Amino acid sequence: MAGLLLAGCGQPAGIDGTLVDDWAPLAEPKPFVPPVGVCHPGGLTKVAPLSSFDPVDCATGHRTETVHVGTFAEGAAGRVAPPGEGSPEIRTAFGECDAKAREYVGNEWRGGRLRLGVALPSPEAWTGGARWFRCDMAELTSVERNGDVVSRTASVRDALKAPSSLSLGCYSVRLAPDRSLREMPGVDCAKAHNSEFVGVWHAPETGFPTKDLDWIRLYAECRKLMATYVGAPNDVNLQFRADVVVLVAKPDEWQGGDRGVRCYLWLYQGTVSRSVKGAGLAALPIPRR
């Protein structure tokens, strides 16, 4: 029995006695990076920890969709914690998300009832090496009056490539007693309306508009879009034919890089029952006082 045990401890032919020297080295563990084109049951968020990653089929009920995933560049990547709200790094990330979102939906996403947000890794994931930022998109019931997030059952990919139910169109602007904007519900362009979405102006890197001079610039740029939309000259008489409604992002979103300004034509008097797009000056008579 002893001889058998000793024989069992010997080295078989061709074995050098070192068990691991011929094994391939283990791959360096890599941080989780979220995929593009997946949908999520939760709403827009600023932090997306791995524990909350629970994607669903975009054909089933969901509230957000990832349209792009980017990587922070060297400067931001060297930080010990994720970039803070409104930081230059977040503005740069939003700019990339903005461009990629337009490609994803097939057009300017602000031309639809859509909202874009940037989600970052958790502080723990950042410490572990995660340097991604996630660009998520949600459909809203309204972009004009801080609408709620809609539960969708289809992807937003190419959703604005052609006019669709998501597209911004015609509205019925209603004023409060003090002449301020009370509401502007969307209506069928074939029915009576006094306002139409005319386009988006991208403001430069400036602070959130607070002074009259700031707003004058925004109104002037929106009038240019209105003139192009209608097919009318952008002259001194245009402001007497129609006004504009200007919609900007919230101050914190503006500081975070969302400088897209939605512009709407607004008729001073009366209504129309067809779109004024391309209709020329005849569609915008100077109202009688």
Placement of each model-derived feature along the sequence:
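C-terminal motif of bacterial Sec signal peptides marking the signal peptidase cleavage site
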Residues: 5-8
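Primary mode marks residue(s) on the alpha4-beta5-alpha5 output face of response regulator receiver
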Residues: 10-289
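Sec-dependent N-terminal signal peptides
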Residues: 1-2
